[in-house]
Regions:
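Interface amphipathic segments
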Residues: 1-393
Length: 393
């Protein structure tokens, strides 16, 4: 059967139970459905009365010619379905079983598999994404605004940022937008175990997890393109929530961290970041083997950072850059009676300084106190150090 221009359908259907659609049993076999993005868009307009979104049409267009095969057996509320898709960028297969359960919910069980799916071409991100080969299994319930399922995923190939990852696995429970479970990597250049919860259901995301990072080769993963050797390990424990610094509340601790770069190494027994933030009060603190940093304010971090940037250009014009003009909305965002305080105390910081800028040295015991008010443009700086040098200059 030819449907419009560009769509070919071969199908065999059996329907029993009409006119009661709830009790009607379908047995539908589609050995072949061939179409294109343009044809699918026109078909959607003819059937549903509206076109597909531009984004979806773009993705379908990137996939080239689409060949589908499908089998559907059962009621609309209880069925078995198999679906296969062959496209110009790779193949996808899916199996799905659905049946009603108590409380208006439906059980869902299924799997999906891709082999050498060229994600970069499909999503038009060839600069970032490569091929993907993966399998995923789902077993749970959906309905009445609820999605609750156990999910298992295995990635044997994933091209990202010019590197091909393998041996990635996800195993956990997905409740709407909350994941609780385990993620592991056994790639030659990325080896970690993640246990815990990431909850995106509320307006403020919540994190409660432990991550054992045994090995990450940042150079081979193309995360660090500056150093030929760049390897990281450590243990991360996070119990916090927040979308940004302005609403970060909780604690993030890194222990037994080691960073090896070129022929040098940095080790840290403990680093802890604590945040206590609301609309009226800002507090963030870093405690580490290298430095202690405390910041207190009533003004948003964004306003503070923009003010410091403008002040740096004003008082240190040698830094260059474009002239920054404060807008009325930014002046309004600053709290009139607030003096923000940044305190930094340094000890054994040279290994970190050298990693940031080769040859940079800062004396132990160096300190900095910065007191400022963006609303009144008042700034006071107090710094003390026996020496700060870079390559003996």
């Amino acid at each position: 059967m030819q449907i419009g221009e560009g769509t070919t359908l071969v199908a065999d259907a059996s329907v029993k139970g009409l006119p009661d659609i709830r009790k009607t049993r379908f047995d539908l076999s589609v050995p072949r459905l061939r179409s294109t993005a343009r044809a699918v868009d026109e078909l959607a307009l003819g059937i549903a009365g509206r076109k597909l979104s531009d984004k979806l049409v773009g993705v379908l267009g990137n996939s080239g010619q689409i060949d589908l095969n499908a089998r559907f057996r059962g009621l609309l509320s209880s069925f078995d379905m198999q679906l296969g898709a062959a496209t110009g960028v790779g193949n996808v297969s899916c199996n799905l079983k659905m049946a009603p359960v108590k409380g208006g919910l439906s059980s869902v069980r299924g799997d999906v598999e891709t082999r050498n799916l060229r994600l970069g071409e499909l999503l038009d991100r060839r600069d970032l994404l490569g091929n993907a080969t993966l399998t995923a299994y789902v077993d749970g319930v959906i309905g009445r605004g609820v999605a609750d399922a156990n999910v298992v995923g295995n990635v044997t190939q994933l091209g990202f940022n010019g590197y091909v990852y393998d041996s990635l696995r996800l195993d956990g429970r997905l409740r709407n937008r909350e994941f609780d479970g385990r993620i592991t990597a056994r790639d030659p250049n990325l080896d970690f175990d993640f246990f815990g919860t990431v909850d995106l259901n509320d307006s403020v995301p919540r994190y409660d997890f432990t991550m054992d990072l045994r090995h990450a080769d940042l150079a081979r993963l193309h995360v660090n393109r500056r150093d030929s050797v760049s390897q990281l390990s450590g243990r991360i424990v996070a119990a916090a929530g927040g979308r940004s610094l302005d609403d970060l509340n909780g604690r993030i601790q890194v222990t037994d961290a080691r960073y090896r770069y070129n022929d040098k190494e940095i080790a840290a027994a403990s680093m802890t970041v604590t945040g206590e933030n609301s609309e009226r009060s800002k507090f963030v603190e870093l405690r580490s083997d290298f430095a202690d940093v405390t910041f207190r304010s009533k003004t948003s971090y964004r306003t503070v950072f923009e003010y410091l940037r403008r002040s740096a250009w004003k008082y240190l014009p040698m830094l260059g850059g474009e002239k920054w003009e404060e807008t009325p909305s930014e002046r309004k965002a600053a709290v009139a009676n607030d003096f923000s305080l940044l305190s930094v105390n340094i000890r054994n910081f040279n290994p970190v300084a050298d990693a940031v800028s080769t040859g940079l040295q800062i004396a132990d015991g160096s300190s900095l106190q910065l007191l400022f008010n963006p609303a009144s443009d008042q700034l006071s700086l107090k710094a003390a150090s026996e020496y700060i040098e870079r390559r003996r200059m």
